[in-house]
């Protein structure tokens, strides 16, 4: 397995293309209003449409509603979902797209238990 690079918080096409041409494998769009890098799905769509083949477009969420995930994923033409909140495995599993689950590392955390809970996740992102 090789290391993959995702550049997150993209809001402009020129930044996305610069990231990709510099070697990024994936481009992340933050669909969380509390972020300074928040983007609307209608703004993300032309950026995702400009991406070369084999670049993964990722929607980043923090405790979203299922309607918001469906809407943004469809409009923005996403290829992968990334959840950073307290989303349950059942919540994450309901979407047609693959997902990554972020885990906020705590001193007493059992990583194996967490990995077992999110078995459907394509990856776990360890956030320190």
Language model: regions and residue ranges:
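Conserved N-terminal beta1-alpha1 strand-loop-helix module at the mouth
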Residues: 1-128
